[in-house]
């Protein structure tokens, strides 16, 4: 061995980058599904347009059925990139994508090899249902991300 880094490390970063590009590029492939995606896109739009970031509204009616974090994040994305199907889904997609390295990190943390951790993360990344849900503007992906991040954080403390 000459002490140089293995080519696999470079390949994994290239794979990670390609996955990220594909993950985000496929967001606007189809229109928003009714009723949920439209609702979770309209509430942040109304926040963004009205400037009232405290009271979520749907068609002008106060809407307190869900926690506001996703609305705030999506409205913030609208203020930077504008309103589109892509920006409506960006928060959920980003959180879904960020779960992948958390799965890898958790697997490594509990003593799995890099190979096993990579297989676990890539299995999640190519699981059809996970990818589909991550590409929908729904609250489920934020919930999944924060539960996964909590499990990973607890593994840092207790393992």
Listing of model-derived features with the role each one plays in the protein:
Residues 2-157:
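Membrane-integral, polyisoprenol-dependent glycosyltransferases
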């Amino acid at each position: 061995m000459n002490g140089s880094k293995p080519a696999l490390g470079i390949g994994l970063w290239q794979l990670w980058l390609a996955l990220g590009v594909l993950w985000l590029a496929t967001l606007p492939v189809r229109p928003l599904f009714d009723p949920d995606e439209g609702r979770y896109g309209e509430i942040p739009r109304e926040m963004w347009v009205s400037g009232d970031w405290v009271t979520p509204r749907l068609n002008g009616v106060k809407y307190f059925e869900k926690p506001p974090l996703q609305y705030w994040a999506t409205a913030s994305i609208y203020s930077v990139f504008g309103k589109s199907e892509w920006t409506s889904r960006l928060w959920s997609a980003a959180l879904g994508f960020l779960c992948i390295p958390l799965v890898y990190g958790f697997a490594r943390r509990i003593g799995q090899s890099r190979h096993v951790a990579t297989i676990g993360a890539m299995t999640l990344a190519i699981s059809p249902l996970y990818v589909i849900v991550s590409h929908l503007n729904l609250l489920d992906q934020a919930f999944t991300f924060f539960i996964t991040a909590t499990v990973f954080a607890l593994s840092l403390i207790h393992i």
